[in-house]
């Protein structure tokens, strides 16, 4: 599933091609993705101008002058690309938003776990209202994590992946950040010290920022809007490396399921 760096990479690739463009038309090749596509998409988008494209957590928000915003999620396998308007659709190209400049924003989603929704007051949308802070914002600190973790017995990895705690830190980057900070993913969230949470918050920021610069992580499905893969996969220290040696100490990496997610860590470097 695309995580925050992949969605941010998509945003940065799309934004220059979309902001200021007038929408010519919308083609829906199916009426639903994960949820039904609301009728406002076909009714309100044609003729509207895109005023901004931004990200909240793993959602892309396309603001318009039509009194609302389109909310998109890439799901497990979705991708968004801006293409010449005469590009023939392929399998799983479910949505086309054609632009006045002759190009088309195309949403491809083989597994249909993505979504395309509409909201007049986008920050009030139920998918966004209860989200925690952005991990790259000033609000996300070790002190914040330590205070919120007080008394919690869930594993720290589960805590870090809770979208009400902090948004956009999925399985890949939670595992990598915990390894960087030297914290076992099995440790109870409420038993991690303030100093270690400060190291963890710094690790999350550093790793996400670096992953964005590297274009995200290509694991099976993610391709950036220009068709290029993400290169952070080449930098992974623990994720997907069960049974291999730790890059820091050489010990064999451990593997377990935590919160129904495959988790890899170093029993020597992470305590």
UniProtKB/Swiss-Prot annotation:
Q: Which SUPFAM superfamilies match?
A: Glucocorticoid receptor-like (DNA-binding domain) (SSF57716), N-terminal domain of MutM-like DNA repair proteins (SSF81624), S13-like H2TH domain (SSF46946)
Catalyzes what? Hydrolysis of DNA containing ring-opened 7-methylguanine residues, releasing 2,6-diamino-4-hydroxy-5-(N-methyl)formamidopyrimidine; 2'-deoxyribonucleotide-(2'-deoxyribose 5'-phosphate)-2'-deoxyribonucleotide-DNA = a 3'-end 2'-deoxyribonucleotide-(2,3-dehydro-2,3-deoxyribose 5'-phosphate)-DNA + a 5'-end 5'-phospho-2'-deoxyribonucleoside-DNA + H(+)
> What does the UniProt function comment say about this protein?
Involved in base excision repair of DNA damaged by oxidation or by mutagenic agents. Acts as a DNA glycosylase that recognizes and removes damaged bases. Has a preference for oxidized purines, such as 7,8-dihydro-8-oxoguanine (8-oxoG). Has AP (apurinic/apyrimidinic) lyase activity and introduces nicks in the DNA strand. Cleaves the DNA backbone by beta-delta elimination to generate a single-strand break at the site of the removed base with both 3'- and 5'-phosphates.
Q: How does it assemble?
A: Monomer.
This enzyme's EC code(s): 3.2.2.23, 4.2.99.18
InterPro entries with a match to the protein in the record = DNA_glyclase/AP_lyase_DNA-bd, DNA_glyclase_Znf_dom_DNA_BS, Formamido-pyr_DNA_Glyclase, FPG_cat, MutM-like_N-ter, Ribosomal_uS13-like_H2TH, Znf_DNA_glyclase/AP_lyase, Znf_FPG/IleRS
Query: What is the name listed in the Swiss-Prot or TrEMBL entry for this protein?
Result: Formamidopyrimidine-DNA glycosylase
> Catalytic residues per the record?
2-3, 58, 261
């Amino acid at each position: 599933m695309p995580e925050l760096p992949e969605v941010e990479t998509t945003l940065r690739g799309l934004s220059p091609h979309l902001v200021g463009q007038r929408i010519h038309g919308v083609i829906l090749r199916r009426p639903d993705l994960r949820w039904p596509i609301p009728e406002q998409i076909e009714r309100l988008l044609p003729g509207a101008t895109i005023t901004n494209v931004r990200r909240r957590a793993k959602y892309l928000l396309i603001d318009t002058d039509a009194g609302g915003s389109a909310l998109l999620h890439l799901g497990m396998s979705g991708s968004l690309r801006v293409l010449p308007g005469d590009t023939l659709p392929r399998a799983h190209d479910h949505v086309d938003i054609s632009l006045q400049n002759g190009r088309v924003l195309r949403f491809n989603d083989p597994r249909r776990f993505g979504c395309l929704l509409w909201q007049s007051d986008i920050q009030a949308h139920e998918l966004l209202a209860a989200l925690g802070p952005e991990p790259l914002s000033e609000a996300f600190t070790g002190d914040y994590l330590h205070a919120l973790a007080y008394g919690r017995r869930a594993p720290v990895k589960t805590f870090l992946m809770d979208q009400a705690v902090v948004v956009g830190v999925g399985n890949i980057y939670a595992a990598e950040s915990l390894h960087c900070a030297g914290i076992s993913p099995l440790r109870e969230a409420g038993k991690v010290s303030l100093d270690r949470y400060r190291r963890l918050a710094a690790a999350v920021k550093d790793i996400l920022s670096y992953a964005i610069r590297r274009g995200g992580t290509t694991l099976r499905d993610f391709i950036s809007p220009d068709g290029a893969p993400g290169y952070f996969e080449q930098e992974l220290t623990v994720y997907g490396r069960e049974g291999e040696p730790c890059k820091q100490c050489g010990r064999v990496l451990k593997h377990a399921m935590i919160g129904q997610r495959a988790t890899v860590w170093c029993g020597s470097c992470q305590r």
